A protein has these predicted regions:
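Serine/threonine-biased, Pro/acidic-interspersed low-complexity stretches characteristic
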Residues: 2-271
Protein backbone atom coordinates (compact mmCIF):
# COMPACT_ATOMS: atom_id res chain seq x y z
CA UNK A 1 0.00 0.00 0.00
CA UNK A 2 1.09 3.59 -0.50
CA UNK A 3 1.38 4.54 3.11
CA UNK A 4 1.20 8.27 2.47
CA UNK A 5 -2.48 8.10 1.53
CA UNK A 6 -3.71 7.66 5.06
CA UNK A 7 -7.26 6.48 5.49
CA UNK A 8 -7.56 5.33 1.88
CA UNK A 9 -6.49 1.89 0.73
CA UNK A 10 -4.52 2.33 -2.48
CA UNK A 11 -2.78 -0.60 -4.18
CA UNK A 12 1.02 -0.51 -4.31
CA UNK A 13 2.43 0.93 -7.50
CA UNK A 14 0.94 4.42 -7.74
CA UNK A 15 -2.49 3.37 -9.00
CA UNK A 16 -4.80 6.34 -8.91
CA UNK A 17 -7.37 6.07 -6.18
CA UNK A 18 -10.91 5.53 -7.38
CA UNK A 19 -12.32 6.53 -4.03
CA UNK A 20 -14.63 9.50 -4.46
CA UNK A 21 -13.69 12.41 -2.25
CA UNK A 22 -16.43 14.13 -0.33
CA UNK A 23 -17.52 17.53 -1.55
CA UNK A 24 -16.37 20.43 0.59
CA UNK A 25 -16.71 24.18 0.77
CA UNK A 26 -13.70 26.37 0.12
CA UNK A 27 -13.10 30.09 -0.09
CA UNK A 28 -11.90 31.42 -3.44
CA UNK A 29 -9.69 34.50 -3.51
CA UNK A 30 -10.37 36.95 -6.28
CA UNK A 31 -7.49 37.66 -8.63
CA UNK A 32 -7.71 41.41 -8.07
CA UNK A 33 -8.38 41.21 -4.33
CA UNK A 34 -11.27 43.72 -4.30
CA UNK A 35 -14.13 41.24 -4.10
CA UNK A 36 -15.43 39.47 -1.05
CA UNK A 37 -14.53 35.77 -0.93
CA UNK A 38 -17.20 33.51 -2.35
CA UNK A 39 -18.00 29.95 -1.40
CA UNK A 40 -18.39 27.27 -4.02
CA UNK A 41 -18.77 23.54 -3.74
CA UNK A 42 -15.68 21.51 -4.62
CA UNK A 43 -15.81 18.27 -6.61
CA UNK A 44 -13.25 16.30 -8.60
CA UNK A 45 -15.77 15.06 -11.16
CA UNK A 46 -19.33 16.32 -11.43
CA UNK A 47 -22.47 15.46 -13.37
CA UNK A 48 -24.00 18.59 -14.90
CA UNK A 49 -26.71 19.37 -17.40
CA UNK A 50 -23.95 18.87 -19.99
CA UNK A 51 -23.32 15.32 -18.76
CA UNK A 52 -20.21 14.22 -16.92
CA UNK A 53 -17.61 16.93 -17.32
CA UNK A 54 -13.88 16.37 -17.72
CA UNK A 55 -11.66 18.21 -15.26
CA UNK A 56 -9.58 21.16 -16.54
CA UNK A 57 -6.03 20.50 -17.72
CA UNK A 58 -2.76 22.24 -18.53
CA UNK A 59 -1.40 21.42 -21.99
CA UNK A 60 1.72 23.60 -22.18
CA UNK A 61 3.82 26.17 -20.35
CA UNK A 62 6.08 28.84 -21.88
CA UNK A 63 8.13 31.77 -20.59
CA UNK A 64 7.15 35.28 -21.69
CA UNK A 65 9.51 38.15 -22.50
CA UNK A 66 8.55 39.63 -19.13
CA UNK A 67 9.73 36.48 -17.37
CA UNK A 68 6.25 35.25 -16.46
CA UNK A 69 4.78 31.81 -17.11
CA UNK A 70 2.27 31.55 -19.95
CA UNK A 71 0.06 28.60 -19.04
CA UNK A 72 -2.19 27.15 -21.75
CA UNK A 73 -4.87 24.56 -21.14
CA UNK A 74 -8.39 23.32 -21.70
CA UNK A 75 -11.63 23.66 -19.76
CA UNK A 76 -15.34 23.93 -20.47
CA UNK A 77 -16.21 26.57 -23.08
CA UNK A 78 -16.36 30.03 -21.47
CA UNK A 79 -15.75 28.55 -18.01
CA UNK A 80 -14.09 30.64 -15.32
CA UNK A 81 -10.64 29.15 -14.66
CA UNK A 82 -8.60 29.75 -11.51
CA UNK A 83 -4.93 29.08 -10.86
CA UNK A 84 -3.95 29.38 -7.21
CA UNK A 85 -0.51 29.62 -5.63
CA UNK A 86 0.39 27.93 -2.31
CA UNK A 87 0.00 31.31 -0.58
CA UNK A 88 -3.64 31.44 -1.69
CA UNK A 89 -3.25 34.10 -4.38
CA UNK A 90 -5.67 33.23 -7.18
CA UNK A 91 -5.50 34.29 -10.82
CA UNK A 92 -8.68 34.07 -12.87
CA UNK A 93 -9.21 33.84 -16.63
CA UNK A 94 -12.14 32.87 -18.83
CA UNK A 95 -11.86 30.03 -21.34
CA UNK A 96 -12.79 30.75 -24.94
CA UNK A 97 -15.70 29.28 -26.87
CA UNK A 98 -13.46 26.30 -27.72
CA UNK A 99 -12.52 25.76 -24.07
CA UNK A 100 -8.94 26.95 -24.52
CA UNK A 101 -7.51 29.29 -21.91
CA UNK A 102 -4.23 31.12 -21.31
CA UNK A 103 -2.98 32.75 -18.14
CA UNK A 104 0.16 34.76 -17.40
CA UNK A 105 1.43 33.89 -13.94
CA UNK A 106 4.38 35.14 -11.89
CA UNK A 107 7.29 32.81 -11.26
CA UNK A 108 8.26 31.93 -7.70
CA UNK A 109 11.81 31.66 -6.47
CA UNK A 110 12.82 28.03 -6.17
CA UNK A 111 10.06 26.83 -8.49
CA UNK A 112 6.40 27.65 -9.10
CA UNK A 113 3.40 25.67 -7.86
CA UNK A 114 -0.16 26.30 -9.03
CA UNK A 115 -3.43 24.48 -8.42
CA UNK A 116 -5.87 24.57 -11.35
CA UNK A 117 -9.65 24.54 -11.11
CA UNK A 118 -12.70 25.76 -13.00
CA UNK A 119 -16.15 26.82 -11.91
CA UNK A 120 -19.15 25.05 -13.38
CA UNK A 121 -22.74 25.39 -12.15
CA UNK A 122 -21.65 26.70 -8.76
CA UNK A 123 -19.03 24.03 -8.20
CA UNK A 124 -15.27 24.14 -8.35
CA UNK A 125 -13.82 21.27 -10.39
CA UNK A 126 -10.17 20.63 -9.68
CA UNK A 127 -7.53 19.44 -12.12
CA UNK A 128 -6.03 15.98 -11.78
CA UNK A 129 -2.92 17.33 -10.08
CA UNK A 130 -0.78 20.36 -9.27
CA UNK A 131 1.38 22.25 -11.75
CA UNK A 132 5.10 22.59 -10.96
CA UNK A 133 7.48 24.67 -13.07
CA UNK A 134 11.21 24.96 -12.22
CA UNK A 135 12.73 28.45 -12.45
CA UNK A 136 13.02 29.32 -16.14
CA UNK A 137 14.26 32.30 -18.14
CA UNK A 138 14.77 31.04 -21.72
CA UNK A 139 11.82 32.25 -23.79
CA UNK A 140 12.96 30.03 -26.66
CA UNK A 141 12.68 26.74 -24.77
CA UNK A 142 9.65 25.43 -22.87
CA UNK A 143 10.41 24.94 -19.15
CA UNK A 144 10.42 21.44 -17.64
CA UNK A 145 6.87 21.76 -16.35
CA UNK A 146 5.06 18.75 -14.91
CA UNK A 147 1.65 17.90 -13.52
CA UNK A 148 2.20 16.49 -10.02
CA UNK A 149 -0.34 13.73 -9.32
CA UNK A 150 -0.87 12.28 -5.84
CA UNK A 151 -0.35 8.53 -5.76
CA UNK A 152 0.69 8.46 -9.44
CA UNK A 153 3.54 9.38 -11.74
CA UNK A 154 3.78 13.04 -12.71
CA UNK A 155 3.07 13.90 -16.34
CA UNK A 156 5.75 15.77 -18.36
CA UNK A 157 4.25 18.75 -20.17
CA UNK A 158 7.24 19.96 -22.18
CA UNK A 159 7.57 18.55 -25.72
CA UNK A 160 11.33 17.90 -25.46
CA UNK A 161 10.97 15.59 -22.45
CA UNK A 162 13.26 12.57 -22.64
CA UNK A 163 12.64 8.85 -22.31
CA UNK A 164 13.00 9.28 -18.56
CA UNK A 165 11.45 12.64 -17.76
CA UNK A 166 10.04 12.12 -14.25
CA UNK A 167 10.39 9.59 -11.43
CA UNK A 168 8.09 9.58 -8.40
CA UNK A 169 8.49 7.74 -5.09
CA UNK A 170 7.18 7.89 -1.53
CA UNK A 171 8.09 6.66 1.94
CA UNK A 172 5.81 3.66 1.54
CA UNK A 173 8.12 2.14 -1.06
CA UNK A 174 6.13 2.88 -4.22
CA UNK A 175 7.81 4.21 -7.36
CA UNK A 176 6.69 5.27 -10.83
CA UNK A 177 8.30 6.67 -13.97
CA UNK A 178 7.07 8.63 -16.97
CA UNK A 179 8.58 10.05 -20.13
CA UNK A 180 8.06 10.84 -23.79
CA UNK A 181 8.78 8.79 -26.91
CA UNK A 182 7.02 7.98 -30.19
CA UNK A 183 3.23 7.51 -29.95
CA UNK A 184 1.80 4.03 -29.50
CA UNK A 185 5.00 2.00 -29.10
CA UNK A 186 6.13 -0.51 -26.49
CA UNK A 187 8.43 0.76 -23.75
CA UNK A 188 10.63 -1.62 -21.72
CA UNK A 189 11.44 -0.64 -18.12
CA UNK A 190 14.45 -1.84 -16.12
CA UNK A 191 15.28 -1.44 -12.43
CA UNK A 192 18.97 -1.71 -11.51
CA UNK A 193 19.66 -3.48 -14.79
CA UNK A 194 16.89 -6.06 -14.41
CA UNK A 195 13.80 -6.20 -16.67
CA UNK A 196 10.75 -4.99 -14.74
CA UNK A 197 7.77 -4.47 -17.04
CA UNK A 198 6.57 -3.33 -20.45
CA UNK A 199 4.06 -0.55 -21.17
CA UNK A 200 2.78 1.26 -24.25
CA UNK A 201 3.05 5.00 -24.87
CA UNK A 202 -0.10 6.99 -25.50
CA UNK A 203 -1.23 8.93 -28.54
CA UNK A 204 0.81 11.93 -27.39
CA UNK A 205 3.94 9.81 -26.90
CA UNK A 206 3.81 9.96 -23.11
CA UNK A 207 4.04 6.72 -21.14
CA UNK A 208 3.65 6.05 -17.42
CA UNK A 209 4.74 2.97 -15.50
CA UNK A 210 4.26 1.89 -11.89
CA UNK A 211 7.43 0.04 -10.91
CA UNK A 212 7.27 -3.30 -9.06
CA UNK A 213 9.83 -2.55 -6.34
CA UNK A 214 10.09 -5.70 -4.25
CA UNK A 215 10.95 -5.21 -0.60
CA UNK A 216 10.31 -1.48 -0.75
CA UNK A 217 12.74 1.39 -1.22
CA UNK A 218 15.73 2.07 1.00
CA UNK A 219 18.06 5.02 1.30
CA UNK A 220 20.67 5.12 -1.44
CA UNK A 221 20.20 5.14 -5.19
CA UNK A 222 18.23 3.19 -7.76
CA UNK A 223 18.94 3.08 -11.50
CA UNK A 224 15.99 3.25 -13.90
CA UNK A 225 16.48 2.16 -17.51
CA UNK A 226 14.03 2.76 -20.37
CA UNK A 227 14.22 1.24 -23.85
CA UNK A 228 11.95 2.30 -26.73
CA UNK A 229 12.81 0.90 -30.16
CA UNK A 230 16.47 1.77 -30.74
CA UNK A 231 16.69 4.30 -27.90
CA UNK A 232 17.92 3.49 -24.39
CA UNK A 233 18.30 5.83 -21.44
CA UNK A 234 19.22 5.39 -17.78
CA UNK A 235 18.88 7.70 -14.79
CA UNK A 236 20.04 7.37 -11.20
CA UNK A 237 17.59 8.46 -8.53
CA UNK A 238 18.71 9.36 -5.01
CA UNK A 239 16.24 8.07 -2.43
CA UNK A 240 15.68 10.57 0.36
CA UNK A 241 13.36 10.93 3.31
CA UNK A 242 12.09 14.52 3.15
CA UNK A 243 10.52 16.18 6.17
CA UNK A 244 8.99 19.27 4.55
CA UNK A 245 7.78 20.63 1.22
CA UNK A 246 10.56 22.01 -0.94
CA UNK A 247 12.08 21.92 -4.43
CA UNK A 248 15.83 21.32 -4.67
CA UNK A 249 18.11 21.26 -7.70
CA UNK A 250 20.51 18.30 -7.42
CA UNK A 251 22.81 18.12 -10.44
CA UNK A 252 20.55 18.26 -13.49
CA UNK A 253 17.41 17.09 -11.68
CA UNK A 254 14.83 18.85 -9.54
CA UNK A 255 13.74 16.93 -6.44
CA UNK A 256 10.27 18.18 -5.55
CA UNK A 257 8.96 17.12 -2.14
CA UNK A 258 5.27 17.96 -1.86
CA UNK A 259 2.41 17.20 0.49
CA UNK A 260 -0.49 15.03 -0.60
CA UNK A 261 -4.02 14.93 0.78
CA UNK A 262 -4.31 12.62 3.76
CA UNK A 263 -0.83 13.51 5.01
CA UNK A 264 2.72 12.64 4.06
CA UNK A 265 5.06 13.66 1.27
CA UNK A 266 5.63 12.43 -2.25
CA UNK A 267 8.89 13.10 -4.10
CA UNK A 268 8.89 13.92 -7.80
CA UNK A 269 12.25 13.96 -9.59
CA UNK A 270 12.21 16.05 -12.77
CA UNK A 271 15.10 15.40 -15.20
Amino acid sequence: MISLLKGIDVPMGFKLSTVALCAASVVLLSGCGDKAPEKVEVADYVATNRGYVKSPEVTSVAVTAAGELLVTGGALPEARVRLTSPSGQAYGVTAGSDGRFQASLPQMSGGSFYDLAMETEGRLMRAEGRLFVPPASDIGAPPRSVLLRPGASALPLWPQAGLIAVVDYDAGGAMAVSGRTDPGIMVDVEIDGQPALEVRSGENGVYTAALPVRGGLRSGTVTIGIRARDRFETRQVSLRQPSAERATLMGVAWYVDWAISGGGLQTTVVF
